[in-house]
A protein has these predicted regions:
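Basic/aromatic-rich interaction segments and small domains that mediate binding to polyanionic partners
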Residues: 27-52
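Loop/turn positions that initiate beta-strands
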Residues: 6-10
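Intrinsically disordered, low-complexity, charged/polar segments
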Residues: 44-119
Length: 119
């Protein structure tokens, strides 16, 4: 991807009926390639302005998936755009840290849309 994403970025992606939000928790470079660690939010938005307004009060957003680990191919299969960057706090990273401590870590090669059950 041509954009230089970083931890704390809020990303917007389009689905048929509107827009969804993701947040970059971390980006790992491994021998097998890049692994994207994301959180996904429940809220869907009819337009970008509504999503932008929600990000301004992001503590009111609800998280549907606190941690998703995706291959680079899976991440790049859904077009996203950066909306804003906000520093992450320990609570944001809790599920990611638990994943790191887990012996049998799984990284998905499914797109964000498929993982979230969206089209």
């Amino acid at each position: 991807m041509s954009q230089n994403f970083q931890a704390g970025d809020f990303l917007i992606f389009q689905i048929e009926s509107g827009y969804g939000l993701l947040r970059v928790l971390a980006i790992d470079e491994t021998e097998g390639g890049t692994v994207w660690h994301l959180a996904a939010y429940n809220e869907m938005f009819m337009d970008i302005d509504s999503a932008d307004a929600a990000i301004e009060n992001f503590n009111n957003l609800t998280i549907s998936y606190p941690h998703l680990a995706l291959t680079n191919r899976a991440f790049e299969s859904t077009q996203v755009a950066r909306m804003k960057n906000e520093p992450l706090v320990n609570e944001d990273l809790k599920a990611f840290v638990e994943w790191q401590d887990y012996l049998h870590r799984k990284v998905s090669d499914l797109s964000v849309r498929l993982l979230l059950g969206l089209r």
